[in-house]
């Protein structure tokens, strides 16, 4: 080697050839061997395993020998047992060390035949021969035949796939072996063993770097060494010492050598720069540096002069996209009126007249014709139903009178302003309390004005022009008196108000402006999401008709924002307003800042309150001039102050306020008087504002010194009066100066004065506390007083109870008994479908937790406990040292009351609708493939032979393949022209927010084993957990208990899905495409019915039907409809219904392409938080927010529920599904479900409420057939609502309600699909509005519209299930949750007068019935009608209700205990591992309809007994073919209703039905003699059917007797005086004698017409009594 012309003495020149010395040229060396050390190994085969044996390892440089003390590890070959262990562990996803060899494949696979089959196939492929039935052989016995083997096909392929799919590109098999050899000293055979161990613990994804790969292989080596019992030590540890000793090269030589290399590199760099024309002189860099230095100097100057806080304070924030609008005053009016008439109590209005007057004023300001009609309608209805409520009559009358008198008036701000003043008291214990107390000597509506007149200079108004000495104070006071009597109207006016934060004077003025009907634009310096709730509530409480409130974020300390704000107001593309007035009340506090402390914050406040006020006014002038407006000056109310430095320590505040007074003179000296008018407002001491709250306790003392203090409402009125037309006109004549200081300026040194007053109050409080302490001390020492020593009391820590939440049992006397006379025995419980259990799993956790948020907006303490458990933050322990909750991570005890403080923030951030937090789905990094054509040959890479062959098949001539040193591997080169797919990551922000399950939720908390968790799709786990909870909700602590009451075939499963399990579907399609390894049984979990199958296999084991509805977003309602029909048809007695769905990246992308989901990026740009993005029915809605989870209900036949004592949450009165019209758009919303309300003419049948209470006439609205055609059809026990579906004169919806004695007016709640999409949210209300109008719902009685998806997002399939759960909770609690995200209701929905959209939760007295509506893509529409359970109970006799109550109390108490125990022990899901019967008994049990399960009292287990089957009591079965009394009553009542409308006035009707099968009285000679005439007997005996003849005559006699409406002499009275003759034309005739004839004459009947109809099993007769002169 030569350096600078000198040959190194220690070197020699070698001539190398590339063909012969390739290794030396590439610096590859053979592995060195320590001299004198012989490696000791066991006998091993000379040939190494094919895949595991690389070409000879690269030779390492011979730097230093290994120390002779190094431990040598024997190189041992693999055993067959190890290979089998690895293959099994890989399939079971278990570490090899955790896999016992004492078990067989069958045992380890848990009985899964598909897994056994797969493992046996892998082992067959691995070894040339294996024993028979390998699945039954213990793993350790696989090594007997051949103790040392090589890797076979299966294991070799697994290792190859591991390396190709999970290792970095530069970390191939050779690199892995080299690392294992160099670092750990492992020989080739042990290297192969490590590779084998790795296939059982693959990394989840491709490792990013070689260092990560080395760390992974180090971990695998450690696991291998631990399983083999050997100790591994890195070889570097033994080499360090020798390596350091071997360094013999002179450092100077090395430095000289490096210097020469650097010089050569610099020369090459310069040559390349010259060729590429790159300037290396640094001139451009110098220019850049100079520019940077200049800019830095300017920045430093700005920072030094203005301070960082000033620069931060002037940053612009105006963004009109973030503005919020509130304007749906008409919906607020509906909400207030409807809530008033449905409230449970009127005591609030009785006890608080002021609150009621405020309420009346609010409604008067919103009064229109629609509201007046609504009030009249509701008051008529409520007169009968609520008249007993104290205070109702007076309140209702006053409300109607108030609305009637103001319906045509403009809205007016009617300020109720009692004269109150500050009052400070000090309690006995020395606590200082402040309150507002009435002022003395004044009263009435104008008491405030009276109090002002008491002081000569409390307020004043005069001209600010020195040339005009006019005093307008008296005019102002007179106008204020008039305003307090009549109100102030601001209709048609527009205002801009800045500084209207909570509790401010500006906010008080805004309230008055809204009450007066004005349009107001308010600026806020905070993000809209943090202030929207406050301004929404302000508008809800004060917005009058025609009013509008807009809120826009704006930094008025920014010059850019000042200009942008005014441009937005006047721009035709913006608001296009011309301001009537501006109130620039924005201010900045600058406490404790004296003159020598002036800083950037002070200057920022000066800019905000003075400089930028001038800027805003100047921009208004510019805009008005540009628009040519010179005759409508904008009034400016300048916020002046008496503080001209008298307070001190407030920065530039006095100077800013004082400088504004210059505008009094500028208006004359400058040119803008045609555009602006000026009115200065000197604001005095205003209590309870941000600046003065701390001084409230001394305000009373201040007033004693002749100073008047004002409340916020009083000051707001003062200011608002200046905006009325009279004073606006005065202001246009010249500037006004309003003094509302209350003589505050007369005080001297205010700081000292205030400090003295504070000190005085504090001293008084301290004296009282000291006196009290002294009194206690004296009492303790007084004679005869024994000191009492109290032991310290341990602090109480409240505990929260985990409860299921069972429904309230209605009070029989108060709620059920009033219904019983008209409903008892009206409906057979066997013909009713009831909901006995429900559950859900969604973004808020369980149904209980979702309801707390939906109805109250916050969690209870019990809710926090449940959520913390569900999110795996806490767990329950029960041992000798502690019983209770502990932190999951630390194990530290956690009290129930501490959970909110410890985990509240975490829970809030990881529940509900939020940015997606899933580990498997990152929308910000969505992976897609880009097809790329290779333009240049790519470098070679190594793959297996199979992969190389596959690549040749795909790329043909565009791929080059050559052998490598490894016989099972090849070197592959992709050549120019090859087409490859390159993965790339793109952000999919559109769908980056969703309603995910609470973070930390795991099915393991419910008791599902880990192997099952990894085996099935997540949606299956959701469904299993929900089904288990639904049974607890039904009070069923073990699902198998139901089979004590029903047969195995009578429980159905109708849980559906829109897309099934996406995780397994993705594995089946995408992972296969990527050549990733997938489970062998992945296909089975892609079917939509598989979760239901898992539910049956793991929990139920029933033989009932599994039907899987697929209705897109309407899947849930389709499932309910299927379950309802199944029970009504008698196919099942109990059904699981509901739906499940998961979040799926591909589906989210598809929804985004349809523009159905909300664009999260745009929503964030508009200032919306994730929780605000789902806004059903709102004017600003922009699409739905996805969610996922599961919802389940347990439906049951009514008699079974009574028999079992199950809690009844609701009655499913009816359901319907409908398609839609012809079209070409699958997702288009439709109106086919209108057919649920189909009827030709509104039913004229008598309501059940107006009928007599006798059984024969207790019927609700029933089928309106024109004539009786079949007695059999009448006696059919199917429910009348179902029979009515086939009629034309009664809608199925009406019939469903009529079945329970309800009308269309009794629907109280409509749960809307309400997805927050443009199309659905207009179509759905239109459908319901059309239905209500068609069915004749009384105008003015709107339904409460619930939009649950504002809280949950849209979960697709479970949507209707969650909605139904919410409806059940509404029925139970009487609470109607509001849509808190509804800022402004879409104006198009104003015409939906039958709907009211609440924005807050409303408490109702009761909810009778609900209507649930759901829609889905693909022409799916459905509705469900539900009825409160008290109507079901009212059909039962009281003893039966009371017996049921006893049963259900026992069941629910046990259910609560069992559920709490299951949560604490993590055993909510009870997995069944075997059938509850012996296998030989299965056919007998399946075939025996009376087979029932029984419980072993000793073990508590449920089993079918082999020796006996419980028999059904024959007495419980009615005689075949005999109609029940209920059916007879229904039939008679139906005919009576159909006949009565066609009768003459005063006519009578009688109906009777006689079953033929039970009519045996004709065989009794005495009966025949007493009741039939001779001619009747002769006719009957000659008839072909003697039984039918006698029965028809008896039936006719009974009908005639009823027609006569005479007093009965008892069931034994003879009927011979009523004779039925056989007419010549075949029609029967009635002949009356004796008492019967007398009764007819007394009733005024001229005659009786009779009709007799015969059926196969019954005879029915109808008798019509005709009045004299009637036809």
From Swiss-Prot:
It comes from the Eukaryota. The keyword Plastid does not apply. Mg(2+) binds at residues 1552, 1653. Residues 75-153 form the Carrier domain. Residues 1244-1270 have a biased composition (Low complexity). InterPro entries: 4-PPantetheinyl_Trfase_dom, 4-PPantetheinyl_Trfase_dom_sf, Fas_alpha_ACP, FAS_alpha_su_C, FAS_alpha_yeast, FASI_helical, Fungal_FAS, Ketoacyl_synth_AS. Acetyl-CoA binds at residues 1552-1554, 1598-1608, 1622-1625, 1652-1654. Keywords: Fatty acid biosynthesis, Fatty acid metabolism, Lipid biosynthesis, Lipid metabolism, Magnesium, Metal-binding, Multifunctional enzyme, NADP, Oxidoreductase, Phosphopantetheine, Phosphoprotein, Transferase. Fatty acid synthase alpha subunit; part of the gene cluster that mediates the biosynthesis of aflatoxins, a group of polyketide-derived furanocoumarins, and part of the most toxic and carcinogenic compounds among the known mycotoxins. The four major aflatoxins produced by A.parasiticus are aflatoxin B1 (AFB1), aflatoxin B2 (AFB2), aflatoxin G1 (AFG1) and aflatoxin G2 (AFG2). Within the aflatoxin pathway, the fungal fatty acid synthase aflA/aflB provides the hexanoyl starter unit to the acyl-carrier protein (ACP) domain of the norsolorinic acid synthase to allow the first step of the pathway. PANTHER family: FATTY ACID SYNTHASE SUBUNIT BETA (PTHR10982:SF21), MALONYL COA-ACYL CARRIER PROTEIN TRANSACYLASE (PTHR10982). This is Fatty acid synthase alpha subunit aflA. It comes from Aspergillus parasiticus (strain ATCC 56775 / NRRL 5862 / SRRC 143 / SU-1). The gene is aflA.
